[in-house]
């Protein structure tokens, strides 16, 4: 999908905050939205949290009308949803880069429609920037890797010899055709598949998946883990839905991908 050039605009206040947190700065401390268990596992995996990073984009999502009786992608809306997320992600990566981080873990992508304007939505990307104790873990583009895996899954991934390259995503906003009255009446009271609806949902998910896979291929990934397939209605009404696919692209660091077998643990209680 073609998009406009992504412009990373970071507020001055954010840059001052990042400068204070940068490793080596006087009184530097880290911030993180990881849980205690996740934080300790990320440290065990050989990474040190350096700061909470975020990116935001307030985006006006325009209007595109689908044909009443037709299944069709609303490509302008697909591009808008994709581009807005890309802006937020890029600004988050820019903050991580300012901290000298090698990657961002536990990334969350959220959308919140605002009441102070019609069709205005804030796209937010937030995660914990981390720096490796040894070596460089940046991707082939020289950017910090991004991952939406939990701290536990990130630890397991690294322990088994894989490296995250980046979050990859695909979006498809699709208009699902209305069922004509004669067909709807003919199906009344019957158990029967509705091929028009089946084809619409199938096609929309496939488009989202294929776009996510194309992003993974661009990163020279071996695979994508933790994939989520989401159906998001937003505010467009019952027959227009965004199908969104997202996951973490990975590649192998070594041929051996075994993990230690779990051990037996006995509690020291009488319950």
What are these regions (language model features)?
Residues 103-115, 223-236, 257-265:
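Short, conserved loop-to-beta-strand elements that form functional interface hotspots
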Residues 30-38, 87-88, 106-108, 146-152, ...:
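Short amphipathic alpha-helical surface micro-motifs
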């Amino acid at each position: 999908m073609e998009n406009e050039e992504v412009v990373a605009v970071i507020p001055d206040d954010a840059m001052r905050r990042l400068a204070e947190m940068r490793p080596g700065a006087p009184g530097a401390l880290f911030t993180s939205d990881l849980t205690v268990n996740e934080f300790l596992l990320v440290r065990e995996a050989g990474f040190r949290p350096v700061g909470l990073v975020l990116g935001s984009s307030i985006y006006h999502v325009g209007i595109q009308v689908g044909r009443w009786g037709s299944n069709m992608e609303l490509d302008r809306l697909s591009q808008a949803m994709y581009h807005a997320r890309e802006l937020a992600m890029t600004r988050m990566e820019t903050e991580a880069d300012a901290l000298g981080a090698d990657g961002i873990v536990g990334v969350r992508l959220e959308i919140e429609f605002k009441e102070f304007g019609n069709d205005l939505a804030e796209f937010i990307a937030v995660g914990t920037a981390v720096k490796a104790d040894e070596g460089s873990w940046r991707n082939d583009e020289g950017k910090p890797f991004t991952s939406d895996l939990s701290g536990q899954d990130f630890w397991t991934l690294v322990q088994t010899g894989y490296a995250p390259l980046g979050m990859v995503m695909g979006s498809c906003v699709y208009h699902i055709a209305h069922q004509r009255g004669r067909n709807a009446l003919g199906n009344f009271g019957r158990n029967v598949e509705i091929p028009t609806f089946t084809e619409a949902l199938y096609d929309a998910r496939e488009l989202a998946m294929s776009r996510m896979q194309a992003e993974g291929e661009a990163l020279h990934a071996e695979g994508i883990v933790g994939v989520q397939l989401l159906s998001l209605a937003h505010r467009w009404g019952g027959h227009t839905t965004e199908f969104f696919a997202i996951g973490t692209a990975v590649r192998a660091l070594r041929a051996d991908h075994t993990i230690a077998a779990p051990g037996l643990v006995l509690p020291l209680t009488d319950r």
